[in-house]
A protein has these predicted regions:
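Boundary/junction segments of secreted and surface-exposed precursor proteins
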Residues: 2-6, 154
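Short glycine/threonine/proline-enriched tight-turn/helix- or strand-capping micro-motif at secondary-structure
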Residues: 9-39, 48
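Residue-level preference for non-acidic, small/hydrophobic
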Residues: 10, 41, 95-98
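Zn2+-dependent peptidoglycan hydrolase active-site motif and core
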Residues: 20-23, 38-88, 110-115
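Residue-level recognition of short, solvent-exposed, well-ordered loop/turn junctions
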Residues: 30, 36, 87-93
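Conserved, short, structured surface segments that act as functional micro-motifs
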Residues: 55-67, 90-143
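Acidic/polar residues in short coil/turn loops that connect beta-strands
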Residues: 70-71, 120, 156-158
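Short, surface-exposed polybasic-aromatic patches that bind anionic ligands, especially phosphate groups
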Residues: 144-181
Length: 181
């Protein structure tokens, strides 16, 4: 499940060399601006925290925290003012629309900062939960692609699409690490 339908552009990764203190990933929805939950759970917070209240969450502007069914907490930050579609206490599923990508809080352009924390509050790499790699680049949700598509393989910027018949042909002729025929 990806945060945005269509193309998801990672503009800043989780704790990469350029920003080792960055506890999340920054994503831009190139085709769709609606932010979707990547996991089910209960909305623990939906709103904004003022700078005067103290704490660092004021930097996130409008944000939604999902207390996941798996014990993790999922944060979707910098949402547009007036765009929140959920409220605290509401149960959500993966795919539920939460709000719209925005530029609220400490932000220098419209994007969504996405963070995942474990049960102890420790930030963990959120890229896999968002269906992207922890690397700057553009990633596409292939779930809406041809049902015959099996998987994508990306190597050195080259993208190869393998369909189910391709994979079945390889499986049929695979023999101890060597292809036959």
């Amino acid at each position: 499940m990806m945060i945005f339908k269509g193309r998801n552009r990672v503009t800043s990764g989780f704790r990469l060399a350029a920003r080792p203190e960055h506890n999340g990933i920054d994503l831009v929805g190139d085709d769709d601006k609606t932010v979707h939950a990547v996991a089910g759970g209960t909305v623990g917070f939906a709103g904004i925290v003022s700078k005067s209240a103290g704490g660092l969450t004021w930097q996130w502007g409008y944000y939604v925290r999902i207390d996941g069914n798996d014990g993790r907490k999922y944060y979707y930050c910098h949402l547009a003012a007036g765009s929140l579609r959920v409220r605290a206490g509401q149960r959500v599923q993966a795919g539920t629309a939460l709000g719209t990508m925005g530029n609220t809080g400490y932000s220098f352009g419209a994007h969504t900062h996405f963070e995942v924390r474990n049960a102890y509050g420790t930030a963990i790499d959120p890229a896999g939960y968002a269906g992207v790699r922890n690397a700057v680049g553009t990633y596409t949700d292939t779930e809406s692609e041809d049902d015959n598509m099996k998987f994508l393989k990306v190597l050195s910027g080259k993208c190869e699409v393998f369909t189910a018949p391709d994979v079945n042909a390889v499986d049929k002729h695979y023999n101890g690490g060597k292809l036959t025929e």
